[in-house]
Amino acid sequence: MNCSGVLALFLSSLLIPFSTMASFYDPVDGKFDMGHHIAENVTGFLPIPILITEPAVGYGGGVAGLFLHESAEEKRIRKEAALKAIDGGAQLVPSAMSVVGALGTENETWFVFGGHRRSWLNDSIRYTGGGGFGVANIDLYKQFSLGNKELNLKFGTSTSVAGLSQKVQFRIGDTPWMIGLKQLFAKSKVESDNRLVDKLMEFTLGTESVTSGLGIEAEFDTRNNLFYPTKGYRFSADYMVFDEVIGSDSNYRNLNIEGEGYIPVSEKWTLGLAGNYQNYEQGDGFVSPTAKPYVELRGVSSFRYQGDEVETLQGQLSYSINHRWKVSGFYGSGKATERADQSNKVNAGGVGFRYQIARRYGLHLGMDYAQSHEERAIYFNIGSGF
């Protein structure tokens, strides 16, 4: 049994009677599996240990619980499919799921969160929402020119925030396309350990600020599994407007385009590709320093490379040892560009593994090790890692 399986089993044993331990083994292959427990128990859920080595916040951890809500008929269909084939049931998307969790790190960053996704009419209408509150202590970087020299200013920030994000989507006929509306609302307070920066933010943003945004989104999705796809594509584009008219203290716009694809190279090998482009337009002279988009790659600190334009490209090659175990190698490149023609590029790569912990749902849990030229980190992931 793998280490993630042992940890998940231990956490689960604290919540359920010992007599139900047999439900943690798959009836088809006899391996450790939590699919039966999630589906057949009223309080069944997947406990997800959170191991944090994010360079931006330091070492830490937490725990999350993933609840998959299905009707009796949906459970019956999934169970029958899982008993007939090794990959049976994994292509069926649960009509509703929820997640709750909490985490904390050594630099006193902490967060409590929850989310829910629900679909109706055979996934013709879909709602996704989530919220949380906590404190994030992170370093931010600002690049500027002084004469012929390019200088980087580093300053610590502490952001206390409570926020809500939600969206509703509607399917276009029987196609893989969905269109919808998005909303984001957050109330935050940002402080800095740099006295000059702190006074500047207090003067321009006030002691507290409200972020309120509305937007539109289009999404195309043909992936064969929501959690760990091995075939198919996903493309999405959204445009968010943050404006005083809808209650925001800051005025800015953000365009976000992202895509990912999974190409079976052979029976054992799968090639994954992912890309992201963001374009940020600032209407006010001053906004919260965390509002700008940043390069998001495994092995790179969050908010380390921010810009008005952000581009990332990633590739991942996965090998299936068997239907339970997967190993992978990945590499990515990112670029953050400011309006003043200043840009930063960063490359990062690493290796990882996954264990299929709930076969009838296609849920994979595992770890990634990644590093860039100046940082390294370990990630405890559920899903592909993109």
Residue map of PLM features:
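Transmembrane beta-strands of outer-membrane beta-barrel proteins
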Residues: 45-47, 96-100, 125-129, 177-181, ...
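Transmembrane beta-barrel architecture of outer-membrane proteins
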Residues: 44-46, 60, 109-111, 159-163, ...
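Outer-membrane beta-barrel channels and translocator barrels
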Residues: 54-56, 70-72, 121-123, 173-175, ...
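N-terminal signal peptide c-region/cleavage motif recognized by signal peptidases
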Residues: 17-19
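C-terminal outer-membrane beta-barrel translocator/porin domains of Gram-negative envelope proteins
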Residues: 207, 214-321
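Predominantly the C-terminal beta-signal and adjacent terminal strand-loop region
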Residues: 269, 340-348, 356-386
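Sequence/structural signature of outer-membrane beta-barrel proteins
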Residues: 70-72, 103-107, 134-138, 186-190, ...
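Gram-negative/organellar outer-membrane beta-barrel architecture
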Residues: 38-45, 51-206, 291, 307, ...
